[in-house]
A protein has these predicted regions:
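Short helix-loop boundary/capping segments
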Residues: 102-151
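Oligomerization/assembly interface segments of phage tail-like spikes and tubes
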Residues: 83-106, 166-181
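A general secondary-structure signal for short beta-strands and their flanking turns/coil
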Residues: 13-15, 89-93, 128-130, 143, ...
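Mixed-charge, glycine-accented linear interaction segment located at domain edges/termini
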Residues: 146-204
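A glycine-rich, hydrophobic loop/mini-helix early in the fold
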Residues: 43-93
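Polar/acidic, low-complexity leader/linker segments enriched in S/T/G and N/D
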Residues: 1-56
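Beta-strand-rich interaction surfaces with strong enrichment in secreted/lumenal proteins
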Residues: 82-84, 137, 160-163
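Short acidic, glycine/tyrosine-flanked loop/strand segments centered on an H-E-D-like triad
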Residues: 64-72, 98-103, 146-159
Length: 204
């Protein structure tokens, strides 16, 4: 089948609004369930497959993806120069910032535990929480939606709360993106780590 390359106006979006949903590790989103996701949805799905909205995220610091490694090396043979290109191992992360300073955020990002009476306590030694993440964004001008699914992510806080007098207090976390056992392999037989849902996937 030919690649679906061409001019597709519905694929052009701005990330005006967005939300991050979390579920147990290796949870996959079916095509039927995908259509239920909106940025305002508190939960999507039921039981072990339920996705929970992490709430208000920063509008100043949107989720930021980063790759480390992946440098190219060109190898030659005695017979031919520049015979083959190989790439170093690549690792991916996403950093996101909540502005919702409730106990749920601290229990999710900081592994906090309830104290007697009031408050939560957390260690400065990071312990990752293994979850599936779905980062959803929406263009309010077109009502188009798109999203990235990270089924196998290790989440931990990346900083202590960032205070501000002219913006919301932010609570930052970073997820290390790992290979998934539930996503399909790519056409080269490699394990995959990320799934992308295009605007057309939300309407079909």
């Amino acid at each position: 089948m030919a690649d679906e390359i061409g001019i597709h106006d519905d694929g052009v979006l701005t990330a005006v609004r967005g939300a991050i949903f979390m579920a147990k590790a290796e949870t996959i989103i079916t095509s039927a369930l995908l259509k239920q996701f909106t940025v305002e949805a508190a939960t999507v799905g039921v039981g072990d497959d339920m996705w929970t909205n992490l709430g208000h995220m920063s509008n100043d610091n949107l989720p930021e993806f980063a790759l480390d490694g992946g440098d190219a090396t060109t190898l030659s043979t005695w017979l031919k120069a520049a015979f083959r290109t190989q790439y170093a191992q690549t690792t991916g992360t996403v950093t996101f910032n909540s502005v919702q300073g409730d106990k749920g955020t601290f229990k999710t990002f900081y592994n906090a535990v309830d104290m007697t009476g009031a408050g939560v306590a957390f260690s400065l030694e990071k312990t990752p929480v293994n979850k599936s993440l779905f980062i959803l964004w929406s263009d309010t001008n077109t009502t188009g939606r798109a999203g990235l699914l990270l089924p196998n992510s290790d989440i931990a806080f990346s900083s202590l709360p960032a205070l501000s007098t002219d913006s919301f207090v932010e609570f930052s976390a970073q997820a290390n993106i790992k290979t998934s056992s539930t996503l399909p392999h790519d056409k080269n037989g490699k394990f995959t780590s990320v799934a992308y849902f295009a605007p057309s996937d939300f309407t079909v």
